[in-house]
Amino acid sequence: MAAMDLRVAAPASVAAAARCGTSLARPWPARAVGGGGGGGGRGRRLSVRTSVATTEAAAAAVGASEDAALEARDSKTVVAVILGGGAGTRLFPLTKRRAKPAVPIGGAYRLIDVPMSNCINSGINKVYILTQFNSASLNRHLSRAYNFSNGVAFGDGFVEVLAATQTPGSEGKRWFQGTADAVRQFDWLFDDAKAKDIDDVLILSGDHLYRMDYMDFVQSHRQRGADISICCLPIDDSRASDFGLMKIDDTGRVIAFSEKPKGDDLKAMQVDTTVLGLPQDEAKEKPYIASMGVYIFKKEILLNLLRWRFPTANDFGSEIIPASAKEINVKAYLFNDYWEDIGTIKSFFEANLSLAEQPPRFSFYDANKPMYTSRRNLPPSMINNSKITDSIISHGCFLDSCRIEHSVVGIRSRIGSNVHLKDTVMLGADFYETDLERGELLAEGKVPIGIGENTKIQNCIIDKNARIGKNVTISNSEGVQEADRTSEGFYIRSGITIVLKNSIIADGLVI
């Protein structure tokens, strides 16, 4: 189910009638007031005047309601700020040479494509992206995918990538200390001429997987007169203690926060989620609401909090918003659909494999709300004599007499004969090696990009440009949970083997 719309709209018949200048009231009978003669005539004239007045009032009310609704959905007065500056230590080694938002997902996309596509599909075309760590590949992808000439058209909007910088003075010699500090260091942007018409600032994360119409969120925020709105998920008992939870009153106003509570503290955070629009039966199963880390601030409120009220606070979720809830109007907004924080190797692995399930919990395939990425002009994949079940094969791949089960295979992947992949996420390659180059490598006893023949791989993430030789076995049969084998080209996190980018796994190796 999509995010709840808390509006109460006028029925279509009311709106249509008002626009046509027609009364919806049942016409008075000819003799409804008085009998014949003068009394009846006076009665009918009164009825007509009343009907006209009622129609005009209804038309004015509906017109005002429609104007307010249109104003609430005006995306030109919204700017999105996507936070992509975290070090991504929990996603290491995938973040060894790239920023978190640049991590590939779904075979052909990068994590940054999710909030960017949601912005485009929501009509929000003013976007700032704040980066700090390993931002080269992220910047390259954004320039290819979302520039004005060759990528997605942004009309009168803009996409600006802003890297953390140091400036003269003691205050200017530090990096981003958190989400709020990152925005504070660039708060001068909101005084710029480009921001003069901005009313609300949408704060997004660059490492979440979900599909959302942000303007539904913005509209709810504006119509309820919120200073800050927090997007939240309904959660059941089994998962509640893994999240930061919020407590709301019967109007949806946030009145308390608790970070990963347990026991009695957890029970104290139960709320009536029907207040936010959840059906009664589902509300009983999910009596908690968890913050998604997606926020809307009134621009002036945001600047006041960052500059004057909390000038040293570093984080929105744990510092500024909880401290502000008692002073200003902070509202919760329910998003009751698929959402995943891709913050760890395990969550990254499981989210990718869930794309290959039937039916998938999330799909990149949606004709009405597509996910965008950079144009690569790759040919269709060539698959020869292979068996593929419950898997995603991206474009530009070469598969020869192999077996692939419940896996995601990224762009430009090469998989040799008699290879068996199961529960594997293969990120693909950045470039092709020609047949001549591959032949020369093999003749010299070296390993070309891709997976060599007779190799068996299970429960594994294979980063880009990896060279895996013949007769290799990767299964972590000993059940090792954590291991760092940089010199051998792999790591193990949460029992999942990660073959490093550009690494070489020699023929016959068993992992």
Swiss-Prot record:
One of its GO terms (cellular component) is amyloplast. The keyword GTP-binding does not apply. Signal peptide: none annotated. Pathway: Glycan biosynthesis; starch biosynthesis. GO terms for biological process: glycogen biosynthetic process; starch biosynthetic process. It catalyses: alpha-D-glucose 1-phosphate + ATP + H(+) = ADP-alpha-D-glucose + diphosphate. Its EC number is 2.7.7.27. Keywords: Allosteric enzyme, Amyloplast, ATP-binding, Chloroplast, Nucleotide-binding, Nucleotidyltransferase, Plastid, Starch biosynthesis, Transferase, Transit peptide. Its main location: plastid. It is found in: Plastid, Chloroplast; Plastid, Amyloplast. The keyword Transferase applies. It comes from the Eukaryota. Activated by 3'phosphoglycerate, inhibited by orthophosphate. Allosteric regulation. It is an enzyme of class 2 (transferase). Pfam families: LbH_GLGC (PF25247), NTP_transferase (PF00483). SUPFAM superfamilies: Nucleotide-diphospho-sugar transferases (SSF53448), Trimeric LpxA-like enzymes (SSF51161). Residues 1-58 form a transit peptide. GO terms for molecular function: ATP binding; glucose-1-phosphate adenylyltransferase activity. Expressed in leaves and stems. Involved in synthesis of starch. Catalyzes the synthesis of ADP-glucose, a molecule that serves as an activated glycosyl donor for alpha-1,4-glucan synthesis. Essential for starch synthesis in leaf chloroplasts and endosperm amyloplasts. Belongs to the bacterial/plant glucose-1-phosphate adenylyltransferase family. Heterotetramer composed of two small and two large subunits. This is Glucose-1-phosphate adenylyltransferase large subunit 1, chloroplastic/amyloplastic. It comes from Oryza sativa subsp. japonica (Rice). The gene is AGPL1.
